[in-house]
Amino acid sequence: MRLNSLSPAEGAKHSAKRLGRGIGSGLGKTGGRGHKGQKSRTGGGVRRGFEGGQMPLYRRLPKFGFTSLKALHVAEIRLSDLAKVDGNVVTLDALKAANVITKDILSAKVILSGKVEKAVVVKGLGVTKGAKAAIEAAGGSIEE
């Protein structure tokens, strides 16, 4: 077997439709587009969500909610992620160095999710009540 002798299985590939190449092809004249109308024309067609002039669903329904821009720069850190940091002092820079958070994060908060395996000192990060209790139970501490 050689690369130049490889070919797809019989019937696995369909030949492309050759539109407008005579009536014998079955796709001559109108080329499968039907007669007249917007969709038969070059460049014809309607945008996504267009409902023929009727007020579309996305405009009939009310707007709601918003996207907090603060959330783009604040990260949630699980307790289990604290073990990924080298050493026992966890800071924002240490989390970035361990690839737990991305470099564009400006602040972070430790949440109660997972388990703390070792005693760690958390510096300069927000901590929830449950996470604080879990860190202190493991022999760690929180520093502002």
Swiss-Prot record:
InterPro entries named in the record: Ribosomal_uL15, Ribosomal_uL15/eL18, Ribosomal_uL15/eL18_sf, Ribosomal_uL15_bac-type, Ribosomal_uL15_CS
Zinc found in the keyword field: no
Pfam families attached to this UniProt entry: Ribosomal_L27A
Function according to Swiss-Prot or TrEMBL: Binds to the 23S rRNA.
PANTHER family: 50S RIBOSOMAL PROTEIN L15 (PTHR12934), LARGE RIBOSOMAL SUBUNIT PROTEIN UL15M (PTHR12934:SF11)
Assembly: Part of the 50S ribosomal subunit.
HAMAP family named among the record's database cross-references: Ribosomal_uL15 (MF_01341)
The name this protein goes by in its record: Large ribosomal subunit protein uL15
Organism name: Glaesserella parasuis serovar 5 (strain SH0165) (Haemophilus parasuis)
